[in-house]
Amino acid sequence: MTIAPFDYVIVGAGTAGCVLAARLSEDRHTRVCLIEAGGPATRAIIRVPALVGAAITNRALTWGLTTLPQTALDSRRIPLPRGKVVGGSGSINGMAYHRGHPKDYDDWAAAGNTGWSWADVLPYFRLSENNIDRRDTGVHGIDGPIHVTFVSKPNPLNQAFLDAFAAVGGYRPCDDFTGLDPEGYGLRQGTIDRGRRDSSARAFLVPALRRPNLTLLTRATVTGIRIEAARATGVDVSAANGPRSVPASREVLLCAGAVHSPQLLMLSGIGPARHLESLGIPVNAELTGVGANYHDHPALAVALEMRNTTSYGLSWHTLPRSLCNLAQYALARSGPLASNVFESTAFIRSSAGADRPDIQIAFQPARRNPNTFPLPLGHGFAMSIVNLYPHSRGEVRLASRDPRVAPLVNPNILIEPEDSAPLLRGLHLVRQLCGTPAFAPYRATEVRPGRSARSDADLKAYMRQAAGTAHHPVGSCRMGIDAMAVVDPTLRVRGIDALRVVDGAVFPGIVGGNTNAPIVMVAEKAADLITGRTNGGRHGG
C-alpha cells in the first residue's frame, strides 16, 4: 500500500527525530511524517526520573542489542541499550545535560566541517534550552522547549563527593558544566521538568502533534530507503497492518541513531560495496565509511556498600521513609523519586598533557544493582570513570539483508592500549576520594573491584572483567570532506540526493560529555540547513 506523499519523511522518533519533526512542521504548509518502530512513551518508568535503571534495562523499551564479543574485555558481549520507543534513547537515558567541551566543536570545524565550530553551534544549544537555574542568555537558553535544572534537594552524599575532591586537592569546583569552561567538580543539571523526565518527545513532539500537517506512525519499522536515479524518494515500512511505502517529495531524513542509521543505509545499497555485494544487496552508492568510525565512551565503575542508610535505596530500615517518598512524589512530584540519581560529577584532566578534561568521574549516591529491579536494593554509592576521548574505533555491519535481523556492532572497546590508561588513573583517583575524611562517617566497603585488587595488574584485570560503555555511541555515518565521510557538513549523504542523516552517527568525533544535548543541537541546526532559515530569525533566548 502506498500513501499520499509527504514533503519530509523522518525515520526514527528518537532524540533528533522528535526535534526535527517539531521544527519542520512549524511551517503549516509542510507535510511531515515521523516514523517510529516502538510505541508511545507512556510508561511510568519513563516519566519518573528515579526509575531510570528500570527504563534502560526494559526489553519492551529497547532493541535488545548486545555487541559482538570484545577482544579487550575478556570476549564479553556488552549490553547496548538503544531506545525503541517514542523519544528513542532520550526516553530511557540518565537525563544528564552536558554539551561537551567547546574545543570539541572547534575540532570538528578544523577538520573541514564548516559551520560546526563552538561559535556556530552555541546558538543551537541555546535554542532548545530552558535553563531554570542559569539565566545567562549569552551561554544558556531560557525559553526553549527542554527544561534543564538541578535536582532541588540533592542527596547528602553528593556533598561528601565534593568535599573529597577538595580534600585531595589539585582540582577546582565548577558551577556550570555546560558553560565556556566545563572543568572541575560540582553538582550537575538534568533534563527534568517539575519532577518528570523532559525528553525531546515530551518537550518538542507532544506539543507539535496538535498540528494537522504532522503525522506520527508508531510500531512501524522502516525496512529500507527507496532510491531512484540516485535520489531518495521515500521509505518502505513494515507494520501490523502490512507493508507500505511512504513517499517523500522533498527529503528523507534518517534519525535512527548510530546503530540503525548505518544499518538502513546499507540495507538500501549505500555503504561498502564488497560488504553489500557479499549479502546480495545492489549497490546504489559506494560509501566505505558507512558503519565505520563507530565509537563510544569506555566506562568502569567502583562500587561501595554501607550499612548507613543515607543513600538512595530500599531496605527494611528505610521502608517508612520510602513510603513517604512515594507519597511525596505522587502528591507533589518532588523528593528522591524526582531525582535522576546522577546529581554530581567531575570533568578533570587525568594527565598533565591533556588540553581539556579527558575523564569524567560520575557520582551515584545509590548502590549499583547487579539486577534490574527498578530501585536500588540496599545502600551504598558508586563512582564511574569515563574515558571522554577514546582512540578505539569499531564498526556496524549487516548480519543479513533481512531488516529484521539485528546488525553486528563491534565497538572495539579498549582495543587501543592507550584507552586503558585514563581509566586506570581514574581508578586510583576514586580510591583516593573514598579514602578522604569526607566519606569516613559512612564506613563504606569497596565491593567492586574490592580491596584485594591492589596492583595495576589487578586493576587492569578488573577493567577487562567489568568495563563497558557510557551508552553514547556516535560516529558511524561521519560528517566530513574526505573519502571516508558519509555526510557533508550540511548532513547530506554523499552520492544520493534528498537524503540526510541527522543524529549522533554524524559526529566526526565523540564529545567530552553526555551526548543527548549535542544530538538535540544537531537536529536544531539540521532544521535550519534543510529549510534555509537561520537561528536568529526563528527563536529568541
Indicate residue ranges for each PLM-predicted region.
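N-terminal redox-cofactor-binding region of secreted/periplasmic oxidoreductases
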Residues: 1-541
